Amino acid sequence: MSKSTAEIRQAFLDFFHSKGHQVVASSSLVPHNDPTLLFTNAGMNQFKDVFLGLDKRNYSRATTSQRCVRAGGKHNDLENVGYTARHHTFFEMLGNFSFGDYFKHDAIQFAWELLTSEKWFALPKERLWVTVYESDDEAYEIWEKEVGIPRERIIRIGDNKGAPYASDNFWQMGDTGPCGPCTEIFYDHGDHIWGGPPGSPEEDGDRYIEIWNIVFMQFNRQADGTMEPLPKPSVDTGMGLERIAAVLQHVNSNYDIDLFRTLIQAVAKVTGATDLSNKSLRVIADHIRSCAFLIADGVMPSNESRGYVLRRIIRRAVRHGNMLGAKETFFYKLVGPLIDVMGSAGEDLKRQQAQVEQVLKTEEEQFARTLERGLALLDEELAKLSGDTLDGETAFRLYDTYGFPVDLTADVCRERNIKVDEAGFDAAMEEQRRRAREASGFGADYNAMIRVDSASEFKGYDHLELNGKVTALFVDGKAVDAINAGQEAVVVLDQTPFYAESGGQVGDKGELKGANFSFAVEDTQKYGQAIGHIGKLAAGSLKVGDAVQADVDEARRARIRLNHSATHLMHAALRQVLGTHVSQKGSLVNDKVLRFDFSHNEAMKPEEIRAVEDLVNAQIRRNLPIETNIMDLEAAKAKGAMALFGEKYDERVRVLSMGDFSTELCGGTHASRTGDIGLFRIISESGTAAGVRRIEAVTGEGAIATVHADSDRLSEVAHLLKGDSNNLADKVRSVLERTRQLEKELQQLKEQAAAQESANLSSKAIDVNGVKLLVSELSGVEPKMLRTMVDDLKNQLGSTIIVLATVAEGKVSLIAGVSKDVTDRVKAGELIGMVAQQVGGKGGGRPDMAQAGGTDAAALPAALASVKGWVSAKLQ
């Protein structure tokens, strides 16, 4: 019996664990601190800084099963998903990595053993082919002489992409930086399937399928294109879980593996589909994976960047459900089946199931309201089409007006053998496409980045003053030996009390000083394992090797500690008051305020905000001890410690506990006891995205300041109302009631004045071909009274055309009224449009009533004078 996908995943990790590799959990689909990458799209993403020499780990071998998304840029698989055997928006990348440890020999031997050993995957050796880079004789000889693959199944691939080192078998991180040749392993499905081996004219067929890519990072590419050998060559490999599952389960399409068969059956059940070969089932089965995991990792549907890509995928899935005949919301119902089929890889998703389902349901309901209208408009346009291409402007209008992603437009057109003018669409969508575009590499010159080989020891948990030594200096990203007064720089010390920004807590400020210099620290950041003090040398000079005294701004750090500890208390309180679906989606902790983003689907009620405040303040009054313990990551999770969204953790973690109330993983700085916080107050609660709320709060002196400010405002209002705080509510109600009464009386007076003005105006109407025409500019009349006046005048004048205007604060307000017996000849909307155009405005409305505005008051007299001629022409 063949292995399940879950068993294949586990076997891969177990094999490399047996070879001394650290099993590392999948990182978030949202890359950590990497703005150049839209989504995690390869297993090596979380180790990028290790490969670049910017970070160090306590292991030199690692293995992962990494969740990946490719949609939205160079790796945009969206339009092909469901129509080919191997395109996905979401996939899992199995990988093993060596950071300056083993190299080509072991990497190749490990791969061969896992694939062919009877204990592991037991693939027939004669079915495996390999490629190597044309000049990589070392890899070729390992495959031929050590592994024993016949020469005819080892293929050299040269620079087949039109430039030096531009090859399917040469991997580059970017224009500069680590790169090297790679060897790829292919599986031959047999001659009953069309296709040729790699490098042949028939290589795009489905017979020979790449299952594993092994990259040998051995060069550092310079800006001038030269290749310098890396001092410690590394290995980065990737094998698509879905691809190897298809091979091991003896099927030719990824969509026929056990995981997808189960999901496709679930899709058929919720949509009512009966034909299990329908490609729309594949589309939806793929899309639920990317959508659910993206939401679980904090991405919310929106019209920008990652949220826009998520929205496109959701809407494409909903549209395919619509094609299958789904009559009600269905997509969210697939989260449960997905969790079941993902096994241990779905544990994070299971914890957030309710939140993910709610976001999907809300988005689907929102799109359902526009889908029908958008499809109808597209049908109209296609019916009028004379050629075989839909113009880009129409495709953009569908997006802009109906939120209809171009992918959906292309899908509909594809079914009718019609192309979409993508160039025209791109021109209209350039800005949105720029925001959503995924960088093809890592988009930076890594030779210019700050690289710190040494590590800094952080001692700020116990010290705010410390003596250290300068180990590195950087100016404009470049290492220097010394800096002088007035220069801005980054200073790295061997040990420091300064906390570097992470976990939502801002970096420390303070001073580095010595006998002859003073360096003002304005921020502190991490650079791999080093801590950089960012600021300006106020006096003297500073050079590498100098001894310094590092002094943290103690008062500022104290305020930050209170805010950070209060954040933990508030997180726990939110889960008690609102439910355990609450999870952190982001945070900011500085010396003035704490800001906390969390998953919740509706605005908090005033009583819920009060309950959270009361609960936090109750823990403050309990004066609970705040304790930290260092333990293994898995032990911390077993203890119930909550992890912070988007953070990376080592295998040994710091667990922060506040009595029996809160336990979280946290590397930040905190108060000693909850009582130190003093007071906690929420100052705002708002929404930041669908399903995400934001609270801002203050503590300690900041909270007391808000109490004083509220009290001062209350006293001022009481003084103005000639009352005291005890009966203030009654006073305000009385004033509001009196105000409402006066406004009502004022409105009645205005209406009486307008009626009188209308009576006076009616005598100014002139006859134009049997129709009364009245055109007038009014002074002292509110724009909102114009409509009432037109109605009165129409009643008085019978067959009539009326144009009234007024100017308030430099803005022109216009209205046109036409009696219904005249609308077949003169339409109010056309008339008002003609006038508005002359005063720099626009407007519209019904044939019998239309309004407009304008900005050019000086042009109003001439515009009104033109009405008579225009009307006369229409009435002839």
Curated annotation (Swiss-Prot):
> Which terms does the UniProt entry file under GO BP?
alanyl-tRNA aminoacylation; negative regulation of DNA-templated transcription
Question: What GO CC terms are in its UniProt record?
Answer: cytosol
Q: Which Gene3D superfamilies match?
A: 2.40.30.130, 3.10.310.40, 3.30.54.20, 6.10.250.550, Bira Bifunctional Protein, Domain 2, Threonyl-trna Synthetase, Chain A, domain 2
| Alphabetized SMART domains for the sequence | tRNA_SAD
Note one Pfam family from the annotation. DHHA1
The PTM N6-acetyllysine maps to: K74
**Which PROSITE patterns does this chain map to?**
AA_TRNA_LIGASE_II_ALA (PS50860)
Provide the reaction this enzyme catalyses. Answer: tRNA(Ala) + L-alanine + ATP = L-alanyl-tRNA(Ala) + AMP + diphosphate
**In which residues is Zn(2+) bound?**
H564, H568, C666, H670
Q: Which family does it belong to?
A: Belongs to the class-II aminoacyl-tRNA synthetase family.
What name has this protein been given in UniProt? Alanine--tRNA ligase
| Species of provenance | Escherichia coli O1:K1 / APEC
